């Protein structure tokens, strides 16, 4: 009976009564999941790039460097120093927004040989895990208090009928932005997890 009560306590994520090891365990799961998504994003982007001609790669990369991802509108640390200074809750909140911004667009991430629906379920699981961590680390603070009304459009006209060149550019943009954002989330969650170990060196 005592073991059942303990298990329910862990699942309820009452941070005030939970030892730090419980949060570390949840962080480890979240970091592992986003690492998998980041690797998947890298692979799909590489597969798409390898299907292009050299000149196409050069032109698309040039355009992408001048363009923005939808998620660039989410306020986040500008460099590694600001990342290290950010609170655990802030890093979790930004990570949550980044993952949430891909819920709709991820349905079109079929740039590789893996099943089309592979990414979306993994994103949903990661989003749920981050939300649990946010609740565990809130300590009474209001979640997303700085920009709770922010809503990002799902890559606008990606689903409209486009010419061949424009469709190619949009696919490149989608895959490149997804890879970029999963790298961000992996970095933020890794730093936040490290913060739970006072003696750890969290230098990026």
Curated annotation (Swiss-Prot):
Zn(2+) binds at residues 36, 186. Residues 1-17 form the signal peptide. CDD domains: somatotropin_like. Its main location: secreted. GO terms for cellular component: extracellular space. The keyword Nucleus does not apply. Disulfide bonds join 69-177, 194-202. This is Somatotropin.
């Amino acid at each position: 009976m005592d073991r059942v009560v303990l298990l329910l306590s862990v699942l309820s994520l009452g941070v005030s009564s939970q030892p730090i090891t419980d949060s570390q365990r949840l962080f480890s799961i979240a970091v592992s999941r986003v690492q998998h998504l980041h690797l998947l994003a890298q692979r799909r982007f590489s597969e798409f790039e390898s299907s292009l001609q050299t000149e196409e790669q050069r032109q698309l990369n040039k355009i992408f460097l001048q363009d923005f991802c939808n998620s660039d509108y989410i306020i986040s640390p500008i460099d590694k120093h600001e990342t290290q200074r950010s609170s655990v809750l802030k890093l979790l909140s930004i990570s949550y927004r980044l993952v949430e911004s891909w819920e709709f667009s991820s349905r079109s991430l079929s740039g590789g040989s893996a099943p089309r629906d592979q990414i979306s379920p993994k994103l949903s699981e990661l989003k749920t895990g981050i939300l649990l961590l946010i609740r565990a680390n809130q300590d009474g603070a209001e979640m997303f208090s700085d920009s709770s009304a922010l809503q990002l459009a799902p890559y606008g006209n990606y689903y409209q009928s486009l010419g061949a060149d424009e469709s190619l550019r949009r696919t490149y943009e989608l895959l490149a932005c997804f890879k970029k954002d999963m790298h961000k989330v992996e970095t933020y969650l890794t730093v936040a997890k490290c913060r739970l170990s006072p003696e750890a060196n969290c230098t990026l």
